């Protein structure tokens, strides 16, 4: 019978695999990009987002599309709602592949409160809404004229017209509007309206969320792809990836004390995917690092038979505690990426 310690490691290995998958999927689109090309998201863009964002992410799609095998990964890694957004724009004559250059989006959790979303709680999101901006070059007048001619459902807010992806009445329907010729916003209606409230000073924005904004500033500009998660989304990630971990009191307590997750990708002649788990203490970080190291070794052993290329990748991963953080790094070559993509290694549902 497996000991509780062994079960903890078994549960943690699933977390590590998902972490590895997340980092690799993001890293995969960046081979050939240069570190010097990594762009910072301007504070004016970050300032558009509501204060209660639980997850904030960024991708430089212009650089990603320069990679020859990006189309193969696009179906696996891009958010489903962004795919809907691309199709929606294409119907109006907008070419997302040439006109949409950067994407930033945020998730707003349902099922948690301002009190329960922080550390020390077991509450996790039970649903979510999305709001995002696509930065690029647009012709708002011609696009909006097309939407009007098609008689798409629309709503006015703060002088802007929001166009519905679907009927405009469903709870999951997404909307779209142009903020200017370089910025298109998309998301659920309530969140878009909140974004406009923030824009015009009627509500507090993400700049007022000191913890998230501090970590966003840390991640911003350090990679072509990066993301920051708050405590509630951190717990949800752990719960979804390794439900067994909640069965063990000490491991479960460690999860409730976790503060944030940060992912960023740097690229030069190769790829360096960096994932940081911010723990509740130095001791927690040391414990988590030990479990992650064991989990990688175990998964590497399991993968040798079915996917030796993945096993090699896991063998190259490094896990180290750094104060109250655990830092995971994954380094990949072009050849490794090509082989792993062919084997559909990155087909993970995020």
Task: List where the protein language model places each region.
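A conserved glycine-rich beta-strand in the N-terminal activation segment of trypsin-fold
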Residues: 172-237
């Amino acid at each position: 019978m497996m000991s509780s310690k062994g079960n903890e490691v078994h549960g943690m290995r699933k977390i590590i695999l998902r972490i590895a998958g997340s980092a690799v999927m993001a890293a995969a689109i960046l081979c050939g990009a240069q570190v010097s090309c990594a762009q910072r998201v301007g504070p004016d863009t970050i300032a558009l987002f509501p204060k209660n964002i639980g997850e904030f992410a960024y991708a430089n799609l212009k650089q990603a599309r320069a990679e020859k095998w990006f189309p193969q990964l696009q179906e696996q890694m891009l958010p489903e709602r962004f795919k809907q957004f691309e199709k929606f724009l294409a119907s109006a004559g907008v070419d997302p592949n040439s006109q949409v250059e950067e994407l930033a989006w945020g998730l707003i959790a349902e099922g948690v409160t301002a009190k329960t979303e922080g550390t020390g709680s077991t509450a996790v999101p039970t649903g979510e809404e999305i709001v995002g901006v696509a930065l690029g070059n647009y012709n708002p007048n011609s696009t909006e004229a097309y939407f009007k001619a098609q008689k798409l459902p629309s709503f006015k807010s703060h002088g802007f017209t929001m166009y519905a992806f679907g009927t405009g009445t469903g709870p999951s329907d997404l909307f779209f509007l142009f903020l200017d010729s370089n910025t298109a916003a998309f998301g659920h209606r309530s969140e878009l309206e909140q974004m406009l409230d923030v824009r015009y000073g009627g509500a507090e924005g993400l700049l007022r969320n000191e913890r998230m904004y501090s970590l966003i500033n840390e991640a911003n500009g350090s990679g072509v792809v990066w993301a920051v998660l708050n405590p509630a989304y951190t717990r949800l990630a752990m719960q979804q990836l390794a439900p067994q971990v909640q069965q063990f009191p000490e491991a479960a307590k460690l999860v409730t004390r976790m503060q944030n997750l940060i992912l960023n990708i740097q690229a030069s002649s190769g790829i360096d995917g960096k994932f940081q788990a911010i723990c509740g203490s130095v001791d927690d970080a040391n414990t988590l690092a030990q479990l992650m190291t064991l989990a990688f070794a175990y998964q590497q052993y399991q993968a040798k038979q079915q996917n030796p290329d993945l096993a090699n990748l896991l063998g190259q991963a490094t896990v180290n505690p750094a104060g109250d953080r655990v830092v995971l790094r994954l380094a990949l070559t072009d050849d490794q990426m090509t082989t792993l993509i062919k084997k559909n290694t990155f087909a993970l549902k995020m």
